[in-house]
């Protein structure tokens, strides 16, 4: 899919109001990733992906050393060490079996993957050493690949995005020029 950034941002601002530069940068990165990703062929599904990122990054995060909310950038889950560890340490369902795994494998990215199992799984599928270096999930291209693969293949919930938002022939081709 191809997007006209000027048109996109004009419509975005009409619907949602002004954007900070860090938000423009984040959305621009997402638009570029979406254009380069042949997996997304539906504007409606892509809209859902963008909305998910908006929700997942709206809790705030640090971008270029500055705390911001609604970042549209890959972020590290916010929370104190104590909070994160109380929620993730020792969680067998996440594969957090080693001391410190709760903190090491806390949420990161556009969709906040958590747990040793998820970092290992996505790292293997993408050919990226996520289990060895979880901060790689903060790179926009890796964060997008996790989001795309997870949604389209059903790796987050067991259901594919098309189970929720089905693809219809010719519907979206009329929406994208």
Residue map of PLM features:
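A residue-level signal for beta-strand positions that form part of recognition/binding surfaces
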Residues: 110, 158, 175
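Short polybasic/polar patches that bind polyanions
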Residues: 35-36, 124
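Ordered core of a single globular domain
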Residues: 29-35
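Acidic helix/loop microenvironments that form the catalytic cleft of cell-wall polysaccharide enzymes
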Residues: 53-57, 162-177
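Extracellular/periplasmic catalytic domains that process cell-envelope and extracellular macromolecules
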Residues: 4, 40-45, 103-106, 139, ...
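Surface-exposed patches in mature extracellular/periplasmic domains of secreted proteins
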Residues: 36-49, 63-66, 157-170
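Peptidoglycan-targeting cell-wall enzymes and recognition modules
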Residues: 2-29, 51-151
């Amino acid at each position: 899919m191809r997007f006209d950034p000027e048109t996109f941002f004009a419509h975005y601002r009409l619907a949602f109001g002004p954007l900070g530069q860090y938000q423009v940068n984040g959305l621009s990165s997402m638009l570029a990733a979406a254009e380069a990703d042949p997996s997304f062929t539906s504007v409606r599904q892509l809209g859902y992906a963008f909305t998910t990122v908006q929700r997942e990054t709206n809790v705030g995060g640090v971008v270029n050393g500055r705390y911001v909310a609604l970042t549209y950038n890959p972020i590290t889950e916010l929370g104190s060490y104590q909070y994160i560890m109380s929620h993730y340490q020792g969680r067998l369902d996440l594969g957090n079996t080693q001391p410190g795994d709760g903190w090491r494998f806390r949420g990161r990215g556009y969709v906040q993957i958590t747990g040793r199992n998820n970092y290992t799984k996505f790292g293997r599928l993408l050919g990226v050493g996520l289990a060895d270096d979880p901060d790689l999930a903060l790179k926009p291209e890796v964060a997008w690949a996790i989001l795309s693969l997870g949604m389209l293949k059903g790796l987050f919930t067991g259901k594919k995005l098309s189970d929720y938002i089905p693809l219809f022939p010719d519907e979206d081709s009329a929406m994208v020029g």
